[in-house]
Amino acid sequence: MSLGLVGRKVGMTRIFTAEGDSIPVTVLDVSDNRVTQIKTVETDGYTAVQVAFGTRRASRVTKPLAGHLAKAGVQAGEILKEFQIDAAKAAELSSGAVIGVDLFEVGQKVDVQGTSIGKGYAGTIKRYNFSSGRASHGNSRSHNVPGSIGMAQDPGRVFPGKRMTGHMGDETVTVQNLEIARIDADRKLLLVKGAVPGAKGGKVFVTPAVKTRAVKGAK
């Protein structure tokens, strides 16, 4: 139950420390997270904040959503996202408020959720890193096949969960414990250490890390 930010993946680059070390980072644009609704236990049964990100023409918004946004005095966005928070945090926010990059700080660990790049229909070698068959020595037409998928007459079926060919990618993926390497407050950018799922321009959700790793040897 933590407040987060909705953003857009700009791409990857690298930054350098004072010692000259190169750090690969992903640049995230988290500008203009506008609060559209505060949900409370009394009105909705739980406590949450709904935010809008990006911009969208008014003509591309349904009338019910247009009324919802007009009530909050917020411009239409590309996406609406809800973050469940506690009542104390919800009391600090109001409809129409803007949540900025100051929500996070340099060195903080965050979880970033995005949609992985779709690969289409893929075989088991690409999808699950299976080994291919022999190129020769009697193998004529079984170079990239997965092999046997079942058993004999008993049990006479393919077990659920068997790794086979199928659609690969285009899934919701969360990368945990990424460190914020730098914050550009003027351009409203977060630079997180490491890779983030999705293609350039893809939507991402940034929240404080849930499973922070303990430092070995720390008391």
Swiss-Prot record:
Polar residues: compositionally biased ranges: 133-145
InterPro entries, A to Z: Ribosomal_uL3, Ribosomal_uL3_bac/org-type, Ribosomal_uL3_CS, Transl_B-barrel_sf
Signal peptide region: none
PROSITE patterns associated with the record: RIBOSOMAL_L3
Cellular component annotations (GO), alphabetically ordered: cytosolic large ribosomal subunit
GO biological process: translation
Keywords assigned: Methylation, Ribonucleoprotein, Ribosomal protein, RNA-binding, rRNA-binding
PTM annotation: Methylated by PrmB.
Function, in words: One of the primary rRNA binding proteins, it binds directly near the 3'-end of the 23S rRNA, where it nucleates assembly of the 50S subunit.
Subunit structure: Part of the 50S ribosomal subunit. Forms a cluster with proteins L14 and L19.
UniProt-listed PANTHER family: 50S RIBOSOMAL PROTEIN L3, LARGE RIBOSOMAL SUBUNIT PROTEIN UL3C
Family membership: Belongs to the universal ribosomal protein uL3 family.
Name this polypeptide is given: Large ribosomal subunit protein uL3
Taxonomic classification: Bacteria, Pseudomonadati, Pseudomonadota, Betaproteobacteria, Burkholderiales
